[in-house]
C-alpha cells in the first residue's frame, strides 16, 4: 500500500508540473530584438543555465507534490503551489507575450510572496518538505531580483 501511495504522489507531481510547464511553454514567445534591447543586470545567468534552473525547479516541484500526497499535507499547500504556478504562467505571458515589464514584475512579486508563504508553512509543518522546496524559493527570489533590476532600469 505504501508503494501505491508513493506512485500516486509521483504521478500527481508529474501531472501538476507538466500542466504548469505546458502552459508556460504555450505562452513563451520570445521577441529577441525586444529582449536584447532591455537593460539586464550583470548577475543574469546565461539562457542555458536558466533553462537548467527551471528544469531543476520542475523536478523539485514533482518531489514536493509527491511528498504532499504521501504525507497527507495536501490542503492548503496544493492551493498555494497552484497559485504560484498560475502567477508564474501569468508572468511568462506578461513578460514575453505582452512585453510589459511592470506587469511581469507584479506577477513575479506575487509568485515570490506566495513562495515565501509556502516556505514558511513547510518549515512549520515538516522540515523535509521545506528543504525540498528551498531551491524553488531561492529561484523565485533570484527571479524577483532580476525582474526588479530589469523593471527599474527600463
Predicted features, each with a name:
Residues 93-103, 124, 149-154:
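Membrane-interface helix caps and helix-loop-helix hairpins in membrane proteins
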Residues 39-53:
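Short aromatic-rich membrane-water interface segments that cap or initiate transmembrane helices
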Residues 72-81, 130:
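Membrane-interfacial loop-to-transmembrane alpha-helix junctions, especially the N-terminal start
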Residues 29-43:
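Membrane-interface helix termini and inter-helical loops of multi-pass transporters
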Residues 39-42, 99-110, 129-134:
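Non-cytosolic membrane-interface motifs at loop->transmembrane helix junctions
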Residues 54-65, 83-88:
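Core segments of transmembrane alpha-helices
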Residues 2-27:
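N-terminal signal-anchor transmembrane alpha helix
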Residues 132-151:
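Final/C-terminal transmembrane alpha-helix of multipass membrane proteins
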